[in-house]
Amino acid sequence: MLTIRLALGGSKKRPFYHLTVTDSRNARDGSHKEQVGFFNPVARGQEIRLSVNEERVNYWLSVGAQTSERVAQLLKEHNKTKAAA
């Protein structure tokens, strides 16, 4: 099953996550089909906290990909901020 989930990047005490489309059986940071955005939980100042390629996310959801719980929360947050702006 295809899953849209977070893959850990960044460095020590400075996490950074890529939103990736991958097979659910692959390792967290293993191979993936496509990167559709990123999430920076410790963004400061002018740094971007969340970036999502909505067109590609919608495509993958339309072909049956499932989101992880955290990614579902992030997409909901992204839609709220987009609607408010």
UniProtKB/Swiss-Prot annotation:
Disulfide bonds: none annotated. GO terms for cellular component: cytoplasm; small ribosomal subunit. It comes from the Bacteria. Gene3D superfamilies: 3.30.1320.10. GO terms for biological process: translation. Keywords: Ribonucleoprotein, Ribosomal protein. InterPro entries: Ribosomal_bS16 (IPR000307), Ribosomal_bS16_dom_sf (IPR023803). HAMAP family: Ribosomal_bS16 (MF_00385). Belongs to the bacterial ribosomal protein bS16 family. This is Small ribosomal subunit protein bS16. The gene is rpsP.
